[in-house]
Regions:
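Glycine-rich phosphate-binding loop of ATP-dependent small-molecule kinases
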Residues: 1-262
Length: 262
């Protein structure tokens, strides 16, 4: 089970420094107090949206540097697969319509190995290799005009921002955009909740990295009462359909959940 205690520990560490205290809000503490409810809904959300065309990759975030390597490895592998398919002239496969949430394979979170470790020397060697690999692949994706959508979710203080910085540190800044997701503006509220994400999806050959995503609809908005039960139930199908549209149009879609457990 996810540790409420570990999250509190990270919040207190952030609050102890004047440079990082601003990152912890009362809303963060409130979510920590509702920890068990969030844990249950997180499992439901991942099980319902872990689809073949846009599967979740659950990352052990207890060790932030190791987490960054796992993310970079997954992104690199997905890029290489997309480039190979493009070079071979293969069409994007068509998937069957999404299944109802209760029909998906369950338990992805429970299968994550949170006991792996890595020494410092091995980490630095792998980091250098992966950064060079990503730099090369980023250029290849631009030449082949393949768009990439990366979505990062996870527990508060799990290290999403640090993982994104390590991932993008050697990429050409002209070819990617980091999209932090805050509360919707009045203009965004006047549209369908997915509209504000559609407007930030990348053009061909570019990458969009979302720090928090459209999954807020079935998590934060659901728990805090910003949408009705009918709306968040419907959102599972809408999200699966949206991701299928992206993949069918040739995009690479990867979703990461940063997991902590102590």
């Amino acid at each position: 089970e996810i540790s409420e205690k570990e999250q509190r520990k990270r919040f207190k560490k952030l609050e102890a420094s004047a440079d990082t205290a601003w990152r912890v809000t009362e809303a963060d503490w409130e979510r920590n107090r509702c920890y068990k409810k969030y844990a249950r809904i997180t499992k439901e959300m991942i099980d319902a949206t872990n689809v073949p065309w846009a599967p979740w990759t659950v990352i052990d975030a207890a060790h932030k540097e190791k987490a960054a390597l796992a993310i970079m490895e997954a992104v690199s592998s997905a890029m290489e697969a997309a480039l190979e398919k493009k070079a071979a002239g293969r069409e994007t496969p068509r998937f069957e319509p999404p299944l109802p949430p209760d029909k998906y394979k369950k338990g992805i979170l429970s299968r994550v190995d949170l006991e792996k470790t890595m020494d410092r020397e091995e980490y630095r060697k792998k980091l250098d290799q992966l950064q060079k690999r990503l730099e090369r692949l980023h250029g290849d994706l631009y030449r082949y005009r393949i768009p990439v959508v990366l979505g990062f979710e996870g527990w508060d203080a799990a290290g999403k921002g640090g993982a994104i910085r390590r991932l993008t540190s050697h990429l050409d800044p002209r070819g990617y955009q980091v999209c932090p997701t805050a509360s919707p503006s009045s203009t965004e509220k006047a549209h369908h909740y997915l509209w504000r994400f559609w407007t930030r999806f990348p053009k061909d050959g570019h990458m969009a990295v979302f720090d928090r995503t459209w999954y807020g609809r079935v998590m934060v908005e659901r728990i805090e009462g910003f949408c009705t039960e009918e709306e968040w139930h419907r959102a599972y199908q809408e999200i699966n359909d949206m991701e299928a549209h992206l993949v069918h149009s040739g995009a690479v879609v990867l979703k990461f959940w940063l997991h902590i457990d102590k």
